[in-house]
Amino acid sequence: SIPLSFFGGIGAASKCGILIKGSNYLEALAQTEIVVFDKTGTLTKGEFAVAEIKPENNISSAELLEIAAHLEAFSAHPIAVSIKKAYGKKPDLQRVSDVRDYFGKGVCGSFDKDEIVLGNAQIMRDKKVKVPEVNSTGTIVYVLKNGHYLGCIIIEDKIKDDAPSA
């Protein structure tokens, strides 16, 4: 009767579109309290967009976005593309120099002769700059100018209309 219950559980999950490879996985699921999905392009559209711009220290949202878009001008990364799209203009490449990519962290470079750092919390820690905690469901891109925090840009991916609700 125990094998029958495993077949029944695996079959019921299959009817809901969930593949369980075997009874040992089904047993492990019985102890599960939290499930996290990271399925860009499956549950989400895979189209990142700027959801919010949070400037600080006497800078406007437009200025913060302009700085970020210029530093991301050479990148094809989805986050960079979303920032450039939100900016809506072609960046003036003469204003940008010495751009360096820090894989998985962000980018650094010069914009109008100012040193700019754009990236996640890890690169901010690496630069020994304390940034405010931001409660957001999206990806947070922090912006520094000459070592001073300017604000952040929140990037989000949209959930597909036909994605099942969790």
Where are each of the predicted segments found?
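Cytosolic catalytic headpiece of P-type ATPases
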Residues: 1-166
